[in-house]
Amino acid sequence: MNQKSNESGAITGGWGCAAPVPPAQAMTVSALRAALAAAPVLPLTVLWPDGDAIEAHFHVTEVGRVQKDFVDCGGTLRRTVTCLLQTWVGDDVDHRITAGKLLKAFEHAGPVLGGEDLPVELEYEACNVVQFFVTAVVTKSDRLVVQLGGKHTDCLAKELCVPSSRLAGEGTGCC
């Protein structure tokens, strides 16, 4: 991952500070599986939101269904469910994962995913564990390119916290 420093010395680039992607714009399991099935022999390249690629020798160590049940700051019970691809970068620098191999992992995960057409996220560990939405897959002549989009946090009960005219201001007291 290429990390750069901005004028204040903060580290940017790679996975940091990506523009957020609404969950509705994340690829679904069926769309990702279709893209993988269309080019099973091609190796995968995964691009950070800023266009840099993760290490080519990454592994997908888990394909899972993650359900998060929570109460937002306004007291509303909420649930999100996603398909999570956990990645790991090992020492085997000659390793390459193909679209067909990832498709096989999805087949093994079928009972866990339960037939739900969930939004797909990818999890990666750098200095911290970070998650991104998978937003697109593009077929090139020599590889399948998986594009990642950023996730973000937000107040889910803004209308209960403060008047909308004050949401952007300091000291609004939201949450």
Label each residue range with its predicted role.
Residues L85:
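Glycine/small-residue-rich phosphate/adenosyl-binding loop
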Residues Q3, E7-V21, H152-C175:
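Cysteine-cluster motifs in flexible loop/terminal segments that predominantly coordinate metals
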Residues E55-L77:
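Short, solvent-exposed beta-alpha or beta-beta edge segments that form flexible loop/patches at the rim
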Residues V89-D94:
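A generic structural motif
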Residues Q3-E55:
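N-terminal, charge-rich interaction modules
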Residues E55-H57, R78-T82, G115-D117:
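Short connector loops at helix/strand junctions that flank enzyme active sites
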Residues K104-E159:
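Helix-rich interaction surfaces within compact, conserved domain-sized segments
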Residues R96-A105:
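Extracellular/virion structural assembly segments
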